[in-house]
Amino acid sequence: WNNFYALSSKLGVAIPEEPLYLLKPSTSYIADGEIVRKPNSYDGKVVYEGELGIVIGKRCKEVSEEQAKDYIFGYTCSNDVTAGQLIQKDPTFAQWTRAKGFDTFGSFGPGIVSGIDDPDKLVIKTILNDQERQNYPVADMIFRPFKLVSMISHDMTLEPGDIISCG
């Protein structure tokens, strides 16, 4: 699953009709600069995914897209690490939470930036060993930040400090 039109086209996959939700355990979170550790229970490939993180600022339930920005405290960088082979192992029963929920698989930071009125002007860039590996404008997202906050808030209550990785 991905949340960008250009990447969907590049990979030759269908545009999703709705976003994929999954919850990460608090033990997966680490701060910027901490080391992502491959678990002993997994011997496959570990991949990075640079993503925009939306930080919720106040309790949020059933808000519209227009109201969503009033519930966003700010934005952060997110490295949504994945044990990719766990998802691919059985396509009929993908292990999303396990593949993304290992200890240290949720890196955020180094800070939270508030006061961004139009997140569509942001660009997600991932640089690994001085090489740019990802470069996607938020405006190319299938489900943009305000839409994601609205959609998720209609399914579950969002609390202050919750982080939505945008995919």
Task: Report residues per predicted region.
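A residue-level signal for conserved active-site and pocket-lining positions in enzyme catalytic cores
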Residues: 1, 54, 80, 108, ...
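Extended, compositionally biased flexible segments
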Residues: 1-50
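Short acidic/polar capping segments at secondary-structure boundaries
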Residues: 3-4, 26-29, 51, 58-62, ...
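Catalytic-pocket segment enriched in acidic/His residues
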Residues: 7, 37, 84-167
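Solvent-exposed alpha-helices and their adjacent loops that cap or buttress functional pockets
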Residues: 13-15, 21, 43-48, 65-70, ...
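A generic structural signal for short beta-strands and their flanking turns/coil linkers
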Residues: 16-18, 25, 48-52, 71-75, ...
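Conserved hydrophobic/aromatic beta-strand scaffold that supports enzyme active sites
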Residues: 21, 28, 53-55, 107-111, ...
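Non-heme Fe(II) oxygenase catalytic core, chiefly the N-lobe of the double-stranded beta-helix
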Residues: 33-68, 73, 77-82
